[in-house]
Amino acid sequence: MMRIALFLITNLAVMLVFGLVLSLTGIQSSSVQGLMIMAGLFGFGGAFVSLLMSKWMALRSVGGEVIEQPRNETERWLVETVRTQSQQAGIAMPQVAIYHAPDINAFATGARRDASLVAVSTGLLQNMSRDEAEAVIAHEISHIANGDMVTMTLVQGIVNTFVIFVSRLIAQVVSGFLSGNRDEGESSNGNPLVYFAVATVLELVFGILASIITMWFSRYREFHADAGSAKLVGREKMIAALQRLKTSYEPQEESSMMAFCINGKSKSFSELFMSHPPLDKRIEALRSGDYLK
């Protein structure tokens, strides 16, 4: 209920900001051109703001702590492993962080390849062998080297723009029709309450459907990150790491972080809405070498 309330409040706030921006620029939001500009600004704007704040948001969501100076042998090994692999991948040394969680997991994020972050859970450090942990770290380094965070942001921006544009275009037609504004030359949002209600419902529906696209891309990049890890540390180490993930607790990270973690949630009514492929499929892809070519 709280999430729905926050969504409605956010949606109303966005619409108010839309109106202010468009009135200041003289663009009519009821025109197709104005609606497209509005959708693009906020569709890509929100995605890129999230990207720019990704390191701060990620650390805050998991309670992660950046290693400024290694305090023990495990932290020294972790930092040196990240340093070695980042040099092999041709990227700048990422920040390294640890967060407390019982599940075996890790993630990478950051707005640029040369200003990134790699974080691992205490569950990973406690339950994986060094070879397995090396493979997981190499997987995250591969995400950074492949520029996955930026590409994911572009995909999300396109999806956001489409959802906002189509939802509000249909809402204009419906609210105008119900308000009696059927003249071809008339441009109006009709009843504001009807417009808001229809736009909100459609954004929810189209947002769920559009997530199929973003989740497909997320699964696709996981296969390539697995292959990147295999190239850095060896195929058998990566396969062993994925097999170890089968014994892990269900990931505890927030849903907003799942696409950036190596271990995604397995409980979903459909694979279409999963950010990660099933572990068995990832292992089979490595064994067949489909993404190593």
From Swiss-Prot:
It holds the Pfam family Peptidase_M48. It is an enzyme of class 3 (hydrolase). Its main location: membrane. The active site is at E140. It is a multi-pass membrane protein. Keywords: Cell inner membrane, Cell membrane, Hydrolase, Membrane, Metal-binding, Metalloprotease, Protease, Transmembrane, Transmembrane helix, Zinc. Binds 1 zinc ion per subunit. Its EC number is 3.4.24.-. The chain crosses the membrane at residues 4-24, 34-54, 158-178, 193-213. Zn(2+) binds at H139, H143, E222. GO terms for molecular function: metalloendopeptidase activity; zinc ion binding. NCBIfam families: PRK05457.1 (NF003965). This is Protease HtpX. It comes from Pectobacterium carotovorum subsp. carotovorum (strain PC1).
